[in-house]
């Protein structure tokens, strides 16, 4: 039986073991998948130990995606562009291939599951950290009219925009740069929503048919999605679908078969009162 794991700090909250168990059952794959806690200064040692124990691949979560990028012996184009790795595959010669499936997971959830149009639309993304960097290239590949990155520290958003300027019409700025803008699609890539707080956003930020997507997820609507509902969002979604879709990309890389994600999302989706 092949063994896989998700590595993080913390890791107890992870839904990945259940997701991959459902994928394995659905596709008839003989594999085990577990959550592994790594010390903040012990990611590389943890990976090496697990590889020595015969593990075939890993998902990587906060805060180790940058370290995984450095540890990988080879990188896919998506990982290189994102500057971060959330999936490692142990190749036949024992070397590590680094991949980033976050952006593909977001785009698949938005376009295929939710039916959101991106081409020719105005996008606003909140945040300028690793989570946002990982999704910019796949979003720009869909041909939005504009993509504006807004962050509390405007310089970080501006630098991120410069890094991706060759891929499409992307700009960056601080939260004040949102004044006068209207978004067809507003994406929260910060963790603020988990802390029951939302960055100060203009009341008229959403276009009349604009919707909101939170890359975070929880058993109840995040603070960001509550803001969205209060400000007339035409649709809202949290990041559960993105989580399942990026997991399916990882699973396909490891096992050579792509699972069906819809049934898994339905199983994991909590019933709202």
Swiss-Prot record:
The gene is aroE. Shikimate binds at residues 14-16, 61, 86, 102, 217. Pathway: Metabolic intermediate biosynthesis; chorismate biosynthesis; chorismate from D-erythrose 4-phosphate and phosphoenolpyruvate: step 4/7. It catalyses: shikimate + NADP(+) = 3-dehydroshikimate + NADPH + H(+). The active site is at 65 (proton acceptor). GO terms for molecular function: NADP binding; shikimate 3-dehydrogenase (NADP+) activity. Pfam families: SDH_C, Shikimate_DH, Shikimate_dh_N. Involved in the biosynthesis of the chorismate, which leads to the biosynthesis of aromatic amino acids. Catalyzes the reversible NADPH linked reduction of 3-dehydroshikimate (DHSA) to yield shikimate (SA). It comes from the Bacteria. GO terms for biological process: amino acid biosynthetic process; aromatic amino acid family biosynthetic process; chorismate biosynthetic process; shikimate metabolic process. PANTHER family: BIFUNCTIONAL 3-DEHYDROQUINATE DEHYDRATASE_SHIKIMATE DEHYDROGENASE, CHLOROPLASTIC, SHIKIMATE DEHYDROGENASE. Keywords: Amino-acid biosynthesis, Aromatic amino acid biosynthesis, NADP, Oxidoreductase. Its EC number is 1.1.1.25. This is Shikimate dehydrogenase (NADP(+)). The lineage of its organism: Bacteria, Pseudomonadati, Pseudomonadota, Gammaproteobacteria, Chromatiales. NADP(+) binds at residues 77, 127-131, 151-156, 215, 239. HAMAP family: Shikimate_DH_AroE. InterPro entries: Aminoacid_DH-like_N_sf, NAD(P)-bd_dom_sf, SDH_C, Shikimate_DH, Shikimate_DH-bd_N, Shikimate_DH_fam, Shikm_DH/Glu-tRNA_Rdtase. Belongs to the shikimate dehydrogenase family. GO terms for cellular component: cytosol. It comes from Thioalkalivibrio sulfidiphilus (strain HL-EbGR7). Homodimer.
């Amino acid at each position: 039986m092949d063994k896989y794991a998700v590595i993080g700090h913390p890791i107890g909250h992870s839904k990945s073991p259940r997701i991959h168990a459902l994928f394995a059952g659905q596709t008839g794959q003989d594999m085990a998948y577990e959550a592994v806690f790594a010390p903040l200064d012990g990611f590389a040692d943890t990976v090496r130990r697990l590889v020595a124990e015969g593990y075939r691949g890993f998902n990587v979560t906060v805060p180790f995606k940058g370290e995984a990028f450095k540890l990988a012996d080879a990188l896919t184009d998506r990982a290189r562009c994102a500057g971060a790795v959330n999936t490692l595959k142990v190749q036949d010669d024992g070397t590590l291939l680094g991949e980033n499936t976050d952006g593909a997971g977001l785009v698949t959830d938005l376009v295929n599951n939710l039916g959101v149009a991106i081409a020719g639309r105005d996008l606003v993304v909140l945040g300028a950290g690793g989570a946002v960097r990982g999704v910019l290239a796949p979003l720009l590949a869909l041909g939005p009219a504009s993509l504006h990155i807004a962050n509390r520290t405007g310089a970080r958003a501006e630098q991120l925009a410069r890094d991706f300027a060759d891929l499409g019409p992307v700009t960056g700025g601080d939260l004040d740069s949102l004044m006068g803008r209207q978004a067809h699609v507003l994406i929260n890539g910060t963790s603020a929503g988990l802390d029951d707080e939302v960055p100060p956003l203009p009341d008229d930020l959403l276009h009349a048919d604009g919707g909101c997507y939170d890359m975070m997820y929880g058993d109840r609507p995040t603070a960001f999605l509550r803001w969205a509902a209060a400000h007339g969002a035409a649709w809202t979604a949290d990041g559960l679908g993105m989580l399942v879709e990026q997991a399916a990309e990882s699973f396909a890389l490891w096992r050579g078969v792509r699972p069906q994600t819809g049934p898994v999302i339905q199983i994991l989706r909590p019933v709202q009162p």
